[in-house]
């Protein structure tokens, strides 16, 4: 029904759209937040530039990749080096606080509303900011979880203790061999619980969150709903963006709002139901408070 080529960008001054979104948020019976990588980037979780140089300059010098994301695909020659990189990566993106209070400001906007969050982010920022865990659906995994690489089971395993130990004890871009994580059931290597292929483990908690999200959609079908999209691009639009467009098109009472600098757009078919704010997410949320 929709495609990127059919969208219209909203590039004018966003003051009117900010006020319109304030009013819509106030009057909405239900708010469904869809969050992508742009929201965490607005909170300061950037994967290149100064932050990358601060934590990974040694890896950059040795392996010549220019950002954290690219490093995640590098074929490190040993598991000790692989986990030295990934433990650092996980530690700074999962077990440190976001530099800016973007998620906290978002919570202030919806704390008194009937809300639910669906996100492709894996950095735990929503829970760290105080969002209700029962109102969150992390579709793509969590940096804070390991899974069997086979996988031999549908379990995930908390990794905070071992990640902290790896980062503390690594030297010369290597962790001690005894810290290499293995599956407690089959002894095969562990990996991150991140959706990359058909080996991604959707554990019991994942399925419970998915059901809560679907239940929220079903039970609010007769209410005035705001679909609030924040920082979602086109890497995986079928998870948040396209469903939000489709659900808005099916319900004349629904409103679709998109805050995303450079990608504030909506299909022409739902233009009259859309509020697109072409602005920095952090600044826009501050203006909405």
Where are these regions (language model features)?
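Conserved catalytic alpha/beta core of Sir2/sirtuin-type deacylases, generalized to analogous enzyme cores
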Residues: 1-289
């Amino acid at each position: 029904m929709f495609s990127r080529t059919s969208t219209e960008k909203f590039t004018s001054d966003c003051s009117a759209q900010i006020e319109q979104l304030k009013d819509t948020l106030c009057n909405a019976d239900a708010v469904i937040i869809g969050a992508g990588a742009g929201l965490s980037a607005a909170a300061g979780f950037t994967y290149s530039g100064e932050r990358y140089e601060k934590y990974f300059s040694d890896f950059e010098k040795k392996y010549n990749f220019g950002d954290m994301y690219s490093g995640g695909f590098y074929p490190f020659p040993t598991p000790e080096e692989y986990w030295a990189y990934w433990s650092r990566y996980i530690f700074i993106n999962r077990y440190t606080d976001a530099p800016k209070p973007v998620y906290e400001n978002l919570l202030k906007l919806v704390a008194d509303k009937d809300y639910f969050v669906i996100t492709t982010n894996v950095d735990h920022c929503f829970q760290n900011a105080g969002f209700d865990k029962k109102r969150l659906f992390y579709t793509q995994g969590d940096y804070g979880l390991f899974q069997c690489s086979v996988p031999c089971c549908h379990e995930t395993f908390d990794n905070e203790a071992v990640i902290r130990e790896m980062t503390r004890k690594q030297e010369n871009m290597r962790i001690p061999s005894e810290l290499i994580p293995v599956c407690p059931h089959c002894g095969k290597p562990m990996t991150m619980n991140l959706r990359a292929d058909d080996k991604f483990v959707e554990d019991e908690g994942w399925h419970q969150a998915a059901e809560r999200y679907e239940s929220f959609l079903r039970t609010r079908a007769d209410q005035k709903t705001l679909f609030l999209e924040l920082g979602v691009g086109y890497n995986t639009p079928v998870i948040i963006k396209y469903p939000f467009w489709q659900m808005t098109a099916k319900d004349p009472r629904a409103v679709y709002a998109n805050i995303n600098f450079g990608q504030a757009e909506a299909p022409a078919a739902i233009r009259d139901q859309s509020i697109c704010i072409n602005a920095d997410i952090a600044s826009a949320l501050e203006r909405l408070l």
